[in-house]
């Protein structure tokens, strides 16, 4: 169950578009990927999974945070397995999974500290105008 939001579909569809984008980016042949200015692969994983976990923590209640973490972890493991199986210039790397976990933990920790439910706060700000 989502938080009480005025635009739940907007937030949920946007989150799923982020997921789809992450899956596509992780399964594209490595030579097709744009350069991100020397940012390490592990940093990309940490930031990406941090953003995903924080996004979903913004639209789901705290009781769902463990499920968000598990779902993103499973997604990351499946993607790494597919990278190894697809033979498109990508390879499975257990260190990527570890980086994903760091990102998930960072995102959910930020959500627990203050950023959880951010979508409700944004909607409240737009309601006042």
Residues of each region from the PLM?
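Bulky hydrophobic segments
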Residues: 1-94, 101, 105-129
């Amino acid at each position: 169950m989502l938080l009480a939001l005025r635009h739940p579909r907007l937030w949920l569809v946007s989150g799923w578009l982020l997921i789809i984008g992450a899956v596509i980016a992780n399964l594209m042949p490595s030579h097709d990927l744009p350069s991100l200015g020397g940012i390490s692969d592990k940093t990309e994983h940490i930031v990406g999974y941090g953003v995903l976990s924080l996004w979903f923590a913004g639209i789901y209640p705290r009781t769902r945070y463990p499920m968000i973490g598990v779902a993103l972890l499973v997604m990351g493991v499946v993607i790494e397995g597919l990278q190894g199986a697809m033979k498109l210039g990508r390879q499975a790397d257990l260190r990527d999974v570890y980086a994903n976990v760091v990102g998930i933990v960072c995102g959910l920790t930020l959500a627990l500290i203050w950023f959880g439910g951010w979508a409700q706060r944004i909607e409240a700000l737009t309601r006042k105008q």
